[in-house]
Amino acid sequence: MAITATRLVSLTLLWIVVLFVTLALIQIKLTDVADPSVNEKILDAKLNQVGEDLEGVTHKVYFDIQINGSPAGRILIGLFGNIVPKTAENFRSLCTGEKGVGNMGKPLYFKGSSFHRIIPGFMIQGGDFTRGDGRGGESIYGDKFADENFKLKHTGPGFLSMANSGPDSNGSQFFITTVTTSWLDGHHVVFGKVLSGMEVVRKIEAQGQDSGVPKANVIIFASGEVSL
C-alpha cells in the first residue's frame, strides 16, 4: 500500500506540472495575440531571418538612407523579376541611374530623392525624383506603364509595391509596407521585398505622421545594385 500511495503522489505531481506548463503556454499565446507590437516584432524577425534565402529574387538593389543629413543605414531589397519583369527592371534601372535623363529633363535615378510620404503603421513612400512632393516621377519606359499583374500580395511588412494614381498609372513612385496591407492587393503591383535593413525602414517610419508629411528630411543618399 505504501508503494501505491507513493506512485499516486508522483502521478498527481506530474499532472500538476503538465497542467501548469499548458496554462503557461496558453497565456503566452494570448499575450502575443493581445499585443500587436509583439506580432510585429515576430514578423520583422522572420523577415530578416529568411531575407537572403527568398526564392525568386532575380536582382538585389539598395538604398543608403540619410535622415536630416545623418546616415541612417542601408536597405537591401530583392526584386522578383521572374514574376513581374517589367516592373522589376524599371525599379532596378532607377536604382542604378543607367538610363540617363528622362523625358522630363531629370535623371532617371533615385539617388538624391526623398521619402515624401510616411504614415506610421502603414508604409513609407518615395520615388518622386522630378518634383519631390508625390506629383511627379517618371518610368524608364516614358511616362506611365500598365499594371503588370497582381500575383504577389502585401502579406506583411517589408514588401515593395508600386504607388499609383489609379489603374495602369505606374511611374517611379513606390512604397514599402510596414504592416500587412491586404486591402491594396489587386490595386498595387508588388515586385520586391526587403532582405535586410528593416530596422532602417522603421527609422524612416518613425519620422512620419498620420497626415503623411514627414517630420524630417529622409533622403536616398545613394542607390544601386549588388550581385546576387
Swiss-Prot record:
InterPro entries: Cyclophilin-like_dom_sf (IPR029000), Cyclophilin-type_PPIase_CS (IPR020892), Cyclophilin-type_PPIase_dom (IPR002130). Residues 62-225 form the PPIase cyclophilin-type domain. It holds the Pfam family Pro_isomerase. One of its GO terms (biological process) is protein folding. Keywords: Chaperone, Endoplasmic reticulum, Glycoprotein, Isomerase, Rotamase, Signal. It comes from the Eukaryota. Its EC number is 5.2.1.8. It is an enzyme of class 5 (isomerase). Glycans are attached at N170. It is found in: Endoplasmic reticulum. GO terms for molecular function: peptidyl-prolyl cis-trans isomerase activity. Expressed in leaves, flowers, roots and stems. It catalyses: [protein]-peptidylproline (omega=180) = [protein]-peptidylproline (omega=0). GO terms for cellular component: endoplasmic reticulum; endosome; Golgi apparatus; Golgi medial cisterna; plasma membrane; trans-Golgi network. SUPFAM superfamilies: Cyclophilin-like (SSF50891). Residues 1-24 form the signal peptide. Its main location: endoplasmic reticulum. The keyword RNA-binding does not apply. Belongs to the cyclophilin-type PPIase family. PPIases accelerate the folding of proteins. It catalyzes the cis-trans isomerization of proline imidic peptide bonds in oligopeptides. This is Peptidyl-prolyl cis-trans isomerase CYP21-2. The lineage of its organism: Eukaryota, Viridiplantae, Streptophyta, Embryophyta, Tracheophyta.
